[in-house]
Amino acid sequence: MSGFYHKHFLKLLDFTPAELNSLLQLAAKLKADKKSGKEEAKLTGKNIALIFEKDSTRTRCSFEVAAYDQGARVTYLGPSGSQIGHKESIKDTARVLGRMYDGIQYRGYGQEIAETLAEYAGVPVWNGLTNEFHPTQLLADLLTMQEHLPGKAFNEMTLVYAGDARNNMGNSMLEAAALTGLDLRLVAPQACWPEAALVTECRALAQQNGGNITLTEDVAKGVEGADFIYTDVWVSMGEAKEKWAERIALLRDYQVNSKMMQLTGNPEVKFLHCLPAFHDDQTTLGKKMAEEFGLHGGMEVTDEVFESAASIVFDQAENRMHTIKAVMVATLSK
């Protein structure tokens, strides 16, 4: 995959549909090779820096395991482990790390930080999550969808995202639909729709590739005929408590539950979630939500749906590692 060598991976629209498909094919091959014991290390001797301004379970573990599988070594720089943007400029950090490492992963805040790292590092930079985009998650999602509907092309699939679509997940889903021709439906209150300019750009590209993008507040209309229903958390521990009540009131009708799944009219519909999910009362935040807002048995998704046979969330989680491995192999090996 010489066309990817030394490229950055910052957002999906930096690539063509053919390039995205190549990454997915590589991920599927690497996954099969690992499971059959035939994986060949392509990154032996490579050193990789993992910058995490925001903590993560899946992203960190995915990058570390993928790197180790491929013979690379990693250095983890956590929220308190680097001076990026505080005592040292992003530009200077990029130039320092670029002299020591072969690739840099960034998970943190503004997209402009990842772009500045990419501009000055001189080595591939990969976006593990920014406020605006989460491209590695969408790679995993697309691979998972292919695995569960192997007889369908993306432009024959319908993906529903229910809940708060004005975040990095909503933005990256728009970009994924633009490149693949998915029938993407963002089912959300209008206050939670993505920026109109990105919607317009991605809708035009999606239509060129045989798909469409729909934004609607109507749950029944939005989920009809869906192959996949996707959601994400409504609130996080870092948000002010006053925001919780406001967000829950806004999104309560968009909870993924058995009724929503049935409204699809598709007995084979699958449930997706990028995790972590507040589907029960077994976490600190989940318990608080249950006590203060009566959300027993789940917030953005009910425990019933999360634990059902329709749920493929742990296939998604595993595929984070395989798709991230594909990105590293494609950009670091000739």
From Swiss-Prot:
GO terms for biological process: arginine biosynthetic process via ornithine; citrulline biosynthetic process; L-arginine biosynthetic process. GO terms for molecular function: amino acid binding; ornithine carbamoyltransferase activity. It is found in: Cytoplasm. SUPFAM superfamilies: Aspartate/ornithine carbamoyltransferase (SSF53671). One of its GO terms (cellular component) is cytoplasm. L-ornithine binds at residues 168, 232, 236-237. It catalyses: carbamoyl phosphate + L-ornithine = L-citrulline + phosphate + H(+). HAMAP family: OTCase. Reversibly catalyzes the transfer of the carbamoyl group from carbamoyl phosphate (CP) to the N(epsilon) atom of ornithine (ORN) to produce L-citrulline. This is Ornithine carbamoyltransferase.
